[in-house]
């Protein structure tokens, strides 16, 4: 059916984003990858997930950063592996999402590790 084909496509989009998080993930790139207009991808994504594709990418990158920070990887390295274009962008997005800086987050992970 037509509906399930779009769902399948979205699963592919999720997988593609997850496996290319560290790269530049523009809508144009997704458009070329999936042979669908970026308007269509954006609309379908929002309709099925309730969030924008940009928001999903940012959140996926931040989740990835958190797991790297939890492994005690230096923040300068985390940022390079994050897919955010600049340290500033990474820093601001992180703080906005979690209400703390990446280094503050690192300190909380160390505390939790000691207390468990």
State what each model feature region is.
Residues 2-13, 49, 53, 58-61, ...:
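N-terminal positioning helix adjacent to the helix-turn-helix/winged-helix DNA-binding module
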Residues 16-18, 24-60, 79-108:
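Basic/polar phosphate-binding segments, predominantly the helix-turn-helix DNA-binding elements
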């Amino acid at each position: 059916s037509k509906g399930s084909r779009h769902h399948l496509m979205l699963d592919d989009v999720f997988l593609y984003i997850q496996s290319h998080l560290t790269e530049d993930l523009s809508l144009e790139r997704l458009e070329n990858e999936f042979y669908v207009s970026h308007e269509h991808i954006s609309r379908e994504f929002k309709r099925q997930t309730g969030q924008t594709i940009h928001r999903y990418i940012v959140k996926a990158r931040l989740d990835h950063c958190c797991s790297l920070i939890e492994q005690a990887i230096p923040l300068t390295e985390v940022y390079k592996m994050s897919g955010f274009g600049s340290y500033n962008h990474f820093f601001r997005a992180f703080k906005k999402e979690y209400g703390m800086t990446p280094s503050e987050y690192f300190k909380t992970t160390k505390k939790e590790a000691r207390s468990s």
